[in-house]
């Protein structure tokens, strides 16, 4: 088996300003070096724990499906979404397992995928790398804010529906006003894929964002194994 990161995070989980403050460093001359060390520390921690701090896309490659209805266990958590399960069929063609044919148990650690009742994993060509599971994992994803449109953009997160609960956090600055950390907000509308407005209550009006915030803004969802 093999785990390949195909779309890395666009940002580190901490802003260099927060790390600089922790190091009691007043000048910015060493920011590039600090970022380099931070990136190495993040990689080490993620590989040690098999947990992804900022959302990224992975491909998990197996030589075959588990026997019959046995589970595929996702090796990097927390799982955001399964994008696709592709396999090389016995005739050599690439096929995709329909979403309706498998179930995802995200309450289990590590998350597991099994065929739904009455279904089985398909037969594959007897060669290495015949099964490829593409998935997104991470505790949170970076957010860009359009304060004039009162919208946020979260392209690295799974598509969300109106009414879903989200939380925001920040590193190296402040959240867009009037948003606060450790506070539940609700998807008020889906402006376009990955772009949303937020409400302070379920079914409420869109929050009027009076600033875009500073530093790094992140979005996560309660229940995603400790997201913000």
What do the PLM-derived regions correspond to, one by one?
Residues 1-142, 222-228:
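Divalent metal-cofactor coordination and adjacent catalytic microenvironments
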Residues 135-228:
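Small/polar beta-strand repeat architecture
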């Amino acid at each position: 088996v093999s785990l390949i990161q195909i779309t890395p995070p666009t940002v580190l989980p901490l802003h260099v300003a927060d790390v600089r403050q922790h190091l009691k460093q007043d000048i910015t001359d060493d920011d590039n070096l600090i970022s380099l060390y931070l990136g190495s520390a993040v990689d080490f921690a993620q590989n040690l724990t098999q947990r992804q701090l900022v959302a990224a896309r992975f491909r998990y490659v197996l030589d075959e499906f588990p026997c019959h209805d046995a589970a595929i266990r996702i090796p990097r958590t927390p799982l955001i979404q399964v994008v696709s399960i592709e396999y090389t069929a016995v005739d050599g063609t690439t096929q995709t397992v329909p979403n309706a044919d498998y179930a995802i148990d995200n309450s289990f650690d590590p998350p597991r995928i099994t065929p739904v009742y009455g279904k089985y994993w398909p037969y594959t060509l007897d060669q290495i790398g015949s099964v490829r599971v593409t998935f997104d994992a991470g505790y949170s994803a970076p957010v860009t804010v359009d304060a004039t449109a009162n919208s946020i953009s979260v392209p690295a997160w799974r598509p969300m529906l109106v009414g879903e609960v989200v939380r925001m956090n920040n590193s190296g600055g402040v959240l867009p006003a009037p948003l606060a950390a450790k506070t539940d907000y609700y998807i008020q509308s889906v402006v376009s894929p990955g772009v949303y407005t937020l409400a302070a209550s379920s079914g409420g009006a869109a929050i009027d964002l009076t600033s875009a915030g500073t530093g790094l803004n992140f979005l996560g969802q309660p229940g995603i194994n400790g997201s913000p």
